[in-house]
Amino acid sequence: MGRITSSRSQLIGDPRHHSLLASKFINCLMLDGKKTTAQRVFYDALEEIGKRHEGEETPIEVFEAALENIKPYIEVRSKRVGGASYQVPMQVNKARQQSLAIRWILAAVRDKKGRPMALKLADELLAGFKKEGAAYTKRENTHRMADANKAFAHFAW
């Protein structure tokens, strides 16, 4: 008998760019069901990126590239073997890569204080695009942990 899988709800692209990724990001950015506020913050951040970025990429391309740069490809997971817990490096599937990248960006932005959310988000996305910033550092630390625990890779299940 096969495992029953739940069906995922269909995501509709965001109103301006028709991007599923942007829509997902806005949903994660939203607090207390205030989607309009989350959209305003996201689009203001994209406008700020448009003003600050001197390249041929559009702001939505900068956003997508930043997210791509922050996605982790490998992470460590705890596995118990004979009374000891090992940090086993494992590959991350696409959906988890995306959700981790979004969560790390938002955590980095929410940790910064004293400026409007849209400006902080624009800063972090531009930093991610340039392979810098707190979210990118988090990704690098995750990869470093996996590399340090390579000896336990044979425990992968």
Curated annotation (Swiss-Prot):
PROSITE patterns the record matches: RIBOSOMAL_S7
Similarity comment: family membership: Belongs to the universal ribosomal protein uS7 family.
GO biological process, one term: ribosomal small subunit assembly
GO molecular function, one term: structural constituent of ribosome
Oligomer status and interactors: Part of the 30S ribosomal subunit. Contacts proteins S9 and S11.
Keywords: Ribonucleoprotein, Ribosomal protein, RNA-binding, rRNA-binding, tRNA-binding
NCBIfam families: rpsG_bact
UniProt-recorded name of the protein: Small ribosomal subunit protein uS7
One Pfam family from the record: Ribosomal_S7
Cysteines engaged in disulfide bonds, as pairs: none
PANTHER family, sorted: RIBOSOMAL PROTEIN S7
CDD domains, A to Z: uS7_Bacteria
Entry keyword Ribosomal protein: yes
Gene Ontology CC annotation, any one: ribosome
Function: One of the primary rRNA binding proteins, it binds directly to 16S rRNA where it nucleates assembly of the head domain of the 30S subunit. Is located at the subunit interface close to the decoding center, probably blocks exit of the E-site tRNA.
